[in-house]
Amino acid sequence: VLVVKRPKGINVHPIQRGGILTREAREALLEWADGYSVCDFCFEGRVDLIQKPPILEFKEEVAEFLGMDDVRFTAGARHAKFAVMNSFRGTVVLDSLAHYTSYIAAELSGLKVYEVPNSGYPEFKVDPQDYAKIFDKVREETGKYPSLALLTHVDYRYGNLNDAKRVGEICQEYGIPFLLNTAYTSGVMEVDGKKLKADFIVGSGHKSWAATAPIGILAIEQNQAAKVLRTSLTRGNWSGRAFTKKEISLFGCSPVFGLPLITLMLSFPTVLKRVKRWEEEIEKVRWFVREMEKIEGMRALGERPRRHTLVQFESPSFHLIAMKHRRKGFFLYDELKKRGIIGIHPGMTKNFKLNIYALSWDEIGKVVEAFKDIAEKYGIEVED
């Protein structure tokens, strides 16, 4: 019998903090774990139209929460991005720190990619005005403006919070549909699509909405719904079979039939409340960065002051230890695990990412003390 157990401790994994299940969601795991568990009372052939459990009502609540007109649930944020991009032809402009799945979705959809540059080391910031410059460049080179623009609200590498509203305004000025990837923002901080001028919002339930994986959220403005949510026109030439309610960009019916959707629903009341506490999370991460940078050589990359709880550090002092240690880069993971801290990628010392979202002040203090203790053990200077 194969038995796999996860390590225990304070989890600072950069892609897991916002997906930690609520008590209500965790209690439902066994009851809803079997296959297509939400489909007992499916009469319309689509998961988003099921009324028992109240998925139809829930998607309307999520649309209101995001300030958008309609919502679908998808097999992760990557599926949501593909559903949008597959409805366009030509070119897409995206930020140069976009997640790899944004590029893959574009490639699979036959879209040519143009990147908006960032400022490089050490802040890696994206200037919203550069979207206009790239739009003009695309027209100059192809004869047409881009079909679509994508902005990663908070990038997965440095945790920079980009100016979505300004990019949305620029997209409106040019008449280019705007896709906002909120995988690391919606669900942990307030996101209002109408205020941000977004035509599409993509979210990640397992990254930021306290749900099991995989589940994404696709929110759409009404003027784009017919384009992206178009239904099947196929009819079998011999059988005459047709599937007129099936939305083709969502594979007819999104594969989110059990725990992903149920946990998303059960965690939603908590999500509604926790986005109101974002300022406290920012207060925590700014204190955390100040304390971590008391370790010799430790430096947070990305924008300052910090506006998100995901942080990448460069740590040349730990890397020097790793070069001489018998465990090489794994020594840091080992030392943290001994002190009850998990989630740092094994083998990483030159740079590493972590996320302290929703940790208590006491837990954050323990993380800081663990790093300082390791530094002192190996002769790295730590400020008082």
Give the location of each predicted region.
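PLP-dependent aminotransferase-like
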Residues: 90-146
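Active-site C-terminal subdomain of aminotransferase-like
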Residues: 205-307
